[in-house]
Regions:
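Specific aromatic-rich, kink-prone transmembrane helix
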Residues: 71, 106-124, 135-138, 325
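Interfacial juxtamembrane loops and adjacent helix segments
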Residues: 1-56
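Membrane-interface alpha helices of multi-pass inner-membrane proteins
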Residues: 94, 128-147, 152-158
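Membrane-interface helix-loop-helix junctions at transmembrane boundaries of multi-pass membrane enzymes
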Residues: 164-171, 262-286
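Membrane-lumen/periplasm interface segments of multi-pass, membrane-embedded glycan/lipid transferases
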Residues: 185-269
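Perimembrane helix-loop-helix junctions
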Residues: 117-126, 150-179
């Protein structure tokens, strides 16, 4: 039984003792931790126990994610059912109900995708310079939390010119993209100065891995390409929680069948311009490639013929971007009587969340 709920607040620093010193996330910027810090800070200000303050941090993280997700859904317009479905994937809420900065990163990712969908599907929307600046600014913030998703800034090049009010739209977009990439390089160099002495992966070395790829590209580039092509297979991990030891494999088929039906219910409802379909597809594939390359360089032993460390949650943003593209590929519109209502999408997602909660609790208590 934990004594944290009886433990009062203190400024005294103590050593880790027998606990594991696992400070391995300090290369992320502070923005991803604002909700958690705010919740814990309120508990500390009110002189609540450490346990209550700890859970306040988690609750504030969930609230922050829900707010960001609601904004993304609102922005998505005709694609709001798909965005709702993705935003309510249990993995999102599991991450949000912790101190993980992924909740803010994912919420921001969905907002950026929602902005893009609004720009290309809203007939009344006219893209102005301020819209481009906002989009680029959000991508800069995202770089500090989910670096591979910096490639979302490339979607600016795939907004039809007729949707804009800018005389030199593509020139301005290109300048913004270059600026974001320059910041990305700066941020990457800055984070490489962080040295986590107590957290080292045996055999992994970025410089050594790059040398291997350059010296024998015909050996190692296919390894990365293979991982990119197999990325879909990692989506089953969206229902594997904890330390990848709490699986819901027994109910995966009906859950994914429901998601498929909801997706196809939106066929014909969403119509992205052809150039936007091409752009979203290219950017999605590039993000998958950058994720695979990043993990191969940083998480995989030098010379290994398999990319290690890949988890399905890394592709949540890609899923949110790809689903509207899939629906745009089909011309035939689904009859109204065969469509799902917004209420049904939310209700079914809540049922899946409830199943996840029951499964997790039952497994944890069974282990105890």
């Amino acid at each position: 039984k934990s004594s944290l709920f009886e433990e009062g607040q203190t400024t005294k620093q103590v050593k880790f003792g027998k606990e594991t010193d696992y400070r391995a996330t300090n290369s992320y910027w502070f923005i991803g931790y604002i909700p958690q810090a705010l919740g814990f800070g309120i508990g500390k200000f009110l002189n609540l126990s450490v346990g209550v303050s700890y859970y306040l941090g988690r609750i504030f993280n969930v609230i922050a994610y829900c707010i960001l997700a609601l904004i993304a859904i609102k922005l998505s317009g005709k694609a709001k059912q798909l965005m709702t479905m993705v935003a309510m994937f249990p993995m999102n809420l599991v991450l949000a109900a912790s101190y993980n900065q992924d909740s803010v990163a994912l919420g921001l990712t969905y907002i950026i995708i929602g902005l893009f969908l609004k720009d290309v599907t809203d007939d009344e929307k006219v893209v102005k310079i301020k819209d481009l600046l906002l989009y680029a600014f959000l991508c800069v913030i995202l770089v500090t939390m989910k670096l591979p998703y910096v490639l979302l800034v490339g979607l600016l090049l795939f907004i039809p010119k007729k949707k804009t009010q800018c005389k030199n739209y593509y020139l301005i977009s290109l300048a913004l993209i270059i600026s974001v990439f320059v910041f990305t390089i700066f941020w990457y160099v800055l984070t490489q100065q962080v040295r986590i002495e107590n957290f080292k992966l045996e055999g992994a070395d970025v410089k050594g891995q790059i040398s291997s790829i350059i010296s024998k590209p015909h050996w190692y580039l296919p390894v990365i390409l293979k991982e990119m092509l197999l990325s879909v297979s990692h989506l089953n991990q969206l229902y594997t929680f904890g330390w990848l030891d709490l699986s819901m494999s027994e109910v995966l088929i009906p859950i994914y069948a429901l998601y498929t039906l909801i997706t196809f219910s939106n066929i014909g409802k969403i119509k992205l311009p052809k150039v936007s379909v091409v752009g979203a597809s290219l950017v999605s594939f590039a993000i998958v490639g950058l994720i695979s390359l990043t993990l191969y360089l940083t998480w995989t032993p030098v010379g290994n013929f398999e990319v290690l460390g890949v988890q399905g949650r890394y592709y949540l943003g890609v899923v949110a971007l790809c689903l509207p593209v899939i629906c745009s590929l089909f011309k035939q519109r689904v009859p109204d009587e065969q469509k799902f209502s917004d209420h049904f999408v939310v209700q079914s997602s809540l049922i899946i969340l409830s199943l996840t909660l029951l499964q997790t609790i039952s497994v944890l208590y069974a282990a105890v």
